[in-house]
């Protein structure tokens, strides 16, 4: 029976992607773990691995196709011992499960003079591609199409099977092992998914365009990244009650320590092994502040308060067309030099769209620094599942009062945005006070 290859969900939030490149062609033999394609998501370009063995019988979605929905049929494999031509014909029946998206237009693509007539439907030789199953809590279970079919035939629950495929995906051999061992519980009806929250809509495009003279503008289609940013920020502002706390931090001691540490950096191949930035020290200070104020290192769910054991700090990085937030994991445990070198690597690969999902998804807090752009102060939008985000302004000379005398100091304004459901004003102020202590007494970050 043909094995359907469907558009994989490369992250829990992925809904669609662009099929950038096929690394196999029809007739090629593949085995589990072989890289077969490259998929562009809204944040990165990622490799897709085969999760079943077989021969590529038919490529359904051509390279360069945009907006391919998760679970849409993209190719058909002939199983071991199966006739490739027969498998290719059988795969046609599943192609109707999802409308085929249009290939990405190029300069060489000429518009069609007239729409082609619809092809007659092929005999249904294979079942339509089914959506990925979910466990009792509605969470997606990552599995191959063949594994889903075998599990259904055997009457076992995929959520009871530990996947051994790429990224924990349940594959054929996992189901066969479960069947022979009798370990999997009988499949039950999945719990009904809760109805999604209704979000308010803004002005329609027609309403907006009516306000401007024809010819005074051009329309630039939204790409996947911009759509995702818009969706998540609207959801954040409509579902998270934001609360803001600001404080001024003096930077003179931090700048002096930074210069001293950079001057003392050992060299390798004629280059210093690290070069600390102010932002590196901000990341460390926030991580230590969360360690000291653990009640602020949380995430909100409708059932529980998720208290995190480590400070995983996301750092907003501007990239063409939007931004991405790579994460420094367990930043409270890392040295300043380790944080600095890790951020340089993450930032470089972020701009190249080469980050893996686990490098930018999750985290427990975030830093958004616009100080290098001369911005004095601003407030950032909380990015769930975070409960906090720190907006960092520029350091500048200001007049401050010490011992009843006016002196000049290098001062930076920071604003903490919090999810008021789990971080109240007093708790936010406590976290910000701890951050300020580390910034103004930076030797504490070295011990």
UniProtKB/Swiss-Prot annotation:
Residues 142-179 form the Peripheral subunit-binding (PSBD) domain. It catalyses: N(6)-[(R)-dihydrolipoyl]-L-lysyl-[protein] + acetyl-CoA = N(6)-[(R)-S(8)-acetyldihydrolipoyl]-L-lysyl-[protein] + CoA. The keyword Transcription regulation does not apply. Keywords: Acyltransferase, Lipoyl, Transferase. Pfam families: 2-oxoacid_dh (PF00198), Biotin_lipoyl (PF00364), E3_binding (PF02817). Residues 108-134 have a biased composition (Low complexity). Gene3D superfamilies: 2.40.50.100, Chloramphenicol acetyltransferase-like domain, E3-binding domain. InterPro entries: 2-oxoA_DH_lipoyl-BS (IPR003016), 2-oxoacid_DH_actylTfrase (IPR001078), Biotin_lipoyl (IPR000089), CAT-like_dom_sf (IPR023213), E2/Pdx1 (IPR045257), E3-bd_dom_sf (IPR036625), LAT1 (IPR006257), PSBD (IPR004167). Residues 91-140 are annotated as: Disordered. Residues 2-78 form the Lipoyl-binding domain. The active site is at residue 420. GO terms for biological process: pyruvate decarboxylation to acetyl-CoA. Its EC number is 2.3.1.12. Binds 1 lipoyl cofactor covalently. GO terms for cellular component: pyruvate dehydrogenase complex. GO terms for molecular function: dihydrolipoyllysine-residue acetyltransferase activity. PANTHER family: DIHYDROLIPOAMIDE ACETYL/SUCCINYL-TRANSFERASE-RELATED (PTHR23151), DIHYDROLIPOYLLYSINE-RESIDUE ACETYLTRANSFERASE COMPONENT OF PYRUVATE DEHYDROGENASE COMPLEX, MITOCHONDRIAL-RELATED (PTHR23151:SF90). Forms a 24-polypeptide structural core with octahedral symmetry. Belongs to the 2-oxoacid dehydrogenase family. The pyruvate dehydrogenase complex catalyzes the overall conversion of pyruvate to acetyl-CoA and CO(2). It contains multiple copies of three enzymatic components: pyruvate dehydrogenase (E1), dihydrolipoamide acetyltransferase (E2) and lipoamide dehydrogenase (E3). This is Dihydrolipoyllysine-residue acetyltransferase component of pyruvate dehydrogenase complex. It comes from Rhizobium meliloti (strain 1021) (Ensifer meliloti).
């Amino acid at each position: 029976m043909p094995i359907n290859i469907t558009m994989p969900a490369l992250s829990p939030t992925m809904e669609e992607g662009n099929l950038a490149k096929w690394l196999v062609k029809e007739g090629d033999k593949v085995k589990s773990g072989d890289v077969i394609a490259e998929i562009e998501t809204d944040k990165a370009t990622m490799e897709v691995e085969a999760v079943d063995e077989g021969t590529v019988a038919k490529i359904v979605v051509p390279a360069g196709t945009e907006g391919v929905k998760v679970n849409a049929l993209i190719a058909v494999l002939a199983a071991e011992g199966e006739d490739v031509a027969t498998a290719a014909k059988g795969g046609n029946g599943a192609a109707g499960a999802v409308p085929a998206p249009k290939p990405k237009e190029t300069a060489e693509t000429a518009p069609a003079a007239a729409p082609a007539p619809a092809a007659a439907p092929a005999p249904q030789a294979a079942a339509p591609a089914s959506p990925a199953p979910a466990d009792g809590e509605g969470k997606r279970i990552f599995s191959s199409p063949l594994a889903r079919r075998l599990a259904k035939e055997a009457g076992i629950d995929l959520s009871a099977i530990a996947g051994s495929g790429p990224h924990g995906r349940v594959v054929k051999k996992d189901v066969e092992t479960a069947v022979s061992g009798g370990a999997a519980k009988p499949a039950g009806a999945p719990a009904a998914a809760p109805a999604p929250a209704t979000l308010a809509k803004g002005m329609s495009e027609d309403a907006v365009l009516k306000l401007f003279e024809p010819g005074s503008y051009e329309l630039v289609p939204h790409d996947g990244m911009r759509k995702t940013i818009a969706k998540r920020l609207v959801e954040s502002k409509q579902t998270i009650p934001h609360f803001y706390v600001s404080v001024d931090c003096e930077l003179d001691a931090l700048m002096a320590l930074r210069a001293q540490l950079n001057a003392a950096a050992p060299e390798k191949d004629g280059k210093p092994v690290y070069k600390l930035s102010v932002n590196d020290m901000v990341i460390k200070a926030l991580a230590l502040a969360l360690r000291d104020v653990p009640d602020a290192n949380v995430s909100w769910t409708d059932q529980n308060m998720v208290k995190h054991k480590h400070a995983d700090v996301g750092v907003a990085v501007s990239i063409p067309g939007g931004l991405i937030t790579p994460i420094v994991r367990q930043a409270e445990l890392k040295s300043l030099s380790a944080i600095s070198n890790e951020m340089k690597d993450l930032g470089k690969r972020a701009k190249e769209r080469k980050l893996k999902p686990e490098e930018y998804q999750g985290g427990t807090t975030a830093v958004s620094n616009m100080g290098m752009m001369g911005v004095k102060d601003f407030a950032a939008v909380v990015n769930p599942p975070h409960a906090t985000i720190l907006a960092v302004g520029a350091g500048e000379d200001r007049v401050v009062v010490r011992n009843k005398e006016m002196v000049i100091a290098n001062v930076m304004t920071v604003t903490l945005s919090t999810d008021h459901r789990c971080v109240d004003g007093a708790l936010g102020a406590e976290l910000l006070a701890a951050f300020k202590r580390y910034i103004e007494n930076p030797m504490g970050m070295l011990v």
